[in-house]
Amino acid sequence: MITNSAAVKPNFHLPMRSFELKNRTSPEDIKALRLITAIKTPYLPDGRFDLEAYDDLVNMQIGQGAEGVIVGGTTGEGQLMSWEEHIILIAHTVNCFGGKIKVIGNTGSNSTREAIHATEQGFAVGMHAALHINPYYGKTSLDGMVAHFRSVLSMGPTIIYNVPARTGQDIPPHVIQTLAESVNLAGVKECVGNDRIKQYTDDGIVVWSGNDDQCHDARWGYGATGVVSVASNLVPGLMRELMFGGVNPTLNSKLLPLIDWLFHMPNPIGLNTALAQLGVIRPVFRLPFVPLPVDKRIEFANLVKEIGREHFVGNKVVEVLDDDDFFLVSRY
């Protein structure tokens, strides 16, 4: 039986409001990034951040050539964090790794007020850039969308994230073209597809693929700068090769079964399951996420053997975990 446990609420405190930027970076520095990993946030059995495991994950990314990390994004379960947790994790990442990798904090919100406040604090603790989603659920007009993004673009380098499958609203190209007038727009993380990516690159707008299964073709056939990747949590070296090594359909085909497996259920369910089976994080899930069923866990172990254990993060033998091995945390 999967265990459901409560957690102690962490005693985090937001930094004081500040307009002094600790780690000023130009948008051009962000535009140059080819491999950005949407980093996983691991947990202790009581639901608090497992910072030791987190540091190991980031170090493995640095060691395998990732150039940036998204902190507290969809993959990092920012939607399950308080803002206090959010900012403390960004600050921790900057303090420990900011000299070795670009730290991009997900400080977006469907509330413009919250997005402004979180972004101020993210830059105050030293993040190099902000990631911003368009307002979701309480959707606005296109004019409202432009006003929302302009409110945060003034603060520093910004990546705009378009994923209508999650937000319920596409950011159309003319909105991005309007926002491109801002010197702080580093680019767009685009999940609509490669035709949209080509449209932006033709307009001189930097764009990263947000889809691991399309990123090879996006990079080498449609002009994408690189990828914001989930799969690189597992195989950072191979994803770097995919982004830096030129056209490589053989490697792309080798990775597609793993990528398909990762997104069989909504992200980050597959990734959380995989990292636990690799032994690099504890098998702890913050609800409402739960592990993949046992047949998919077996499938992952087989994929690791087919691709080669040496290409995956960590050095433990991949395991097929039982239901009893997992902790589900509902209060933290």
UniProtKB/Swiss-Prot annotation:
EC number of the protein: 4.3.3.7
Residues annotated as binding pyruvate: 75, 228
CDD domains: DHDPS
Enzyme class: lyase
SUPFAM superfamilies attached to this UniProt entry: Aldolase (SSF51569)
Catalyzed reaction equations: L-aspartate 4-semialdehyde + pyruvate = (2S,4S)-4-hydroxy-2,3,4,5-tetrahydrodipicolinate + H2O + H(+)
Molecular function terms, GO-annotated: 4-hydroxy-tetrahydrodipicolinate synthase activity
KW tRNA processing (keyword) present: no
Active site: 161 (proton donor/acceptor), 189 (schiff-base intermediate with substrate)
Functional pathway: Amino-acid biosynthesis; L-lysine biosynthesis via DAP pathway; (S)-tetrahydrodipicolinate from L-aspartate: step 3/4
Annotated positions for site Part of a proton relay during catalysis: 74, 137
PANTHER family recorded: 4-HYDROXY-TETRAHYDRODIPICOLINATE SYNTHASE 1, CHLOROPLASTIC, DIHYDRODIPICOLINATE SYNTHASE
NCBIfam families: dapA
Protein family per UniProt: Belongs to the DapA family.
UniProt protein name: 4-hydroxy-tetrahydrodipicolinate synthase, chloroplastic
